[in-house]
């Protein structure tokens, strides 16, 4: 499998830490020092489909194909604009495509799960061109009274078009169920014959220390495994992309693997945790900035509710775009992060 095209889209609305100070018992210093986040993008109601479609259109344009050339659409998302039809079906409609389309739910690791799924269809000879999307409106799921969690999240969409090739060198997917570490209850239905849950829905709930320990240890294990499967070490990778969940997690993984900060770009300071969209958003930003060159090895790792994780090694095959968009602050996150 090779990546043939890539694109992304972000909501227009920017919410700063200072805006959160207006209704939360928090401060810019508190948020930045514990998460590395200074601002995030927030979608309007029912905007996910539009942004996912925009990211998809940009990926198709970059790949030089149209929606009619697609054999499948896979969308990694936690919750779309509709319970049904799927976000993938809505994208298919917008692209005037005529192919199978389905959503895939693996929380923040969903994009890597979807990449591996696409690779399997291509290797089986069932598809030539697959659109893989990571799109999230995760802020709509947040409990905006819980300062420990709501400050973390942001919205966005990223997409890639993949086709046959040998670019995906290794993949590792894991699941270790711990529902209490990170979860959100479904809204109770209106069926009068079913018992309502004892615990009312209240947005995302998280045991922060448990998630931190899992994220750091699992990311290190996954990165070492996929690098070894590719016949390399993590330290030999040209780039290491970690799910943009929390700057302290990213820094802990980098320090324990003794990785050069110049090989671990990040955008969490201005996007927040965009769940399944975080890896494709960062990858597209690097591509548009001219940082990705043919032949470079890219290790990617993500983790999320489940608890689940996914990692892979890609050999990049695309030339940089003709028009570049500078992204200097990918290597200059906020300096006041607490260890």
PLM features: residue spans?
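Short beta-strand segments
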Residues: 7, 76, 105, 130-136, ...
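Claisen-condensing/thiolase-fold acyl-transfer catalytic domains that form or cleave C-C bonds
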Residues: 49, 53-56, 60, 79-80, ...
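Anion-binding (especially nucleotide phosphate/pyrophosphate-binding) glycine-rich loop
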Residues: 62, 66-98
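Flexible, glycine-rich active-site loops centered on histidine and acidic residues
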Residues: 123-157
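Short glycine-rich phosphate-binding loop at a beta-alpha junction
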Residues: 68-76, 234-243
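Acidic-glycine-rich active-site phosphate/pyrophosphate-binding loop
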Residues: 24-31, 82-95, 132-138, 189-196, ...
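Conserved small-residue
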Residues: 3-5, 31, 73, 114, ...
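Condensing-enzyme catalytic core mediating Claisen C-C bond formation in acyl metabolism
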Residues: 1-45, 146-213, 217, 221, ...
């Amino acid at each position: 499998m090779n990546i043939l095209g890539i694109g992304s889209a972000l909501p227009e609305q920017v919410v700063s830490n200072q805006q959160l100070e207006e209704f939360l018992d928090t401060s810019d210093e508190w948020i930045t020092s514990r998460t590395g986040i200074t601002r995030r993008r927030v979608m309007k109601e029912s905007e996910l489909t539009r942004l996912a479609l925009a990211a998809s259109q940009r990926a198709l344009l970059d790949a030089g194909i149209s929606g009619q050339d697609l054999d499948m659409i896979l969308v990694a998302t936690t919750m779309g604009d509709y319970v049904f039809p799927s976000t993938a079906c809505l994208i298919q409609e917008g692209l005037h495509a005529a192919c199978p389309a389905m959503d895939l739910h693996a929380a923040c690791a969903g994009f890597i799960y979807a990449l591996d799924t696409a690779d399997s269809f291509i290797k089986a000879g069932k598809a030539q061109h697959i659109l893989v999307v990571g799109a999230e409106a995760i802020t709509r799921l947040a409990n905006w009274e819980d300062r420990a969690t709501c400050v973390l999240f942001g919205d966005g969409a990223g997409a890639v078009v993949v086709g046959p090739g040998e670019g995906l060198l290794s993949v590792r997917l894991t699941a270790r169920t711990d529902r209490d570490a990170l979860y959100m209850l479904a809204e109770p239905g209106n069926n009068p014959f079913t018992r309502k849950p004892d615990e009312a829905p209240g947005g995302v709930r998280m045991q922060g220390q448990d998630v931190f320990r899992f994220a750091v240890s699992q990311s290190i294990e996954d990165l070492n495994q996929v690098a070894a499967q590719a016949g390399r070490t993590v330290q030999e990778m040209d780039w290491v992309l970690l799910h943009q969940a929390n700057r302290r997690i990213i820094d802990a993984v980098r320090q324990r693997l003794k990785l050069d900060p110049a090989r671990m770009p990040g955008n969490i300071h201005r996007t927040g945790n965009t769940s399944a969209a975080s890896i494709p958003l960062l990858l597209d930003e690097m591509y548009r900035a001219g940082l990705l060159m043919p032949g470079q090895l890219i290790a990617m790792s993500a983790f999320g509710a489940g608890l689940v994780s996914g990692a892979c090694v890609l050999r990049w095959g695309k030339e940089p775009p003709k028009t570049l968009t500078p992204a200097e602050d990918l290597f200059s996150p906020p300096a006041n992060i607490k260890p």
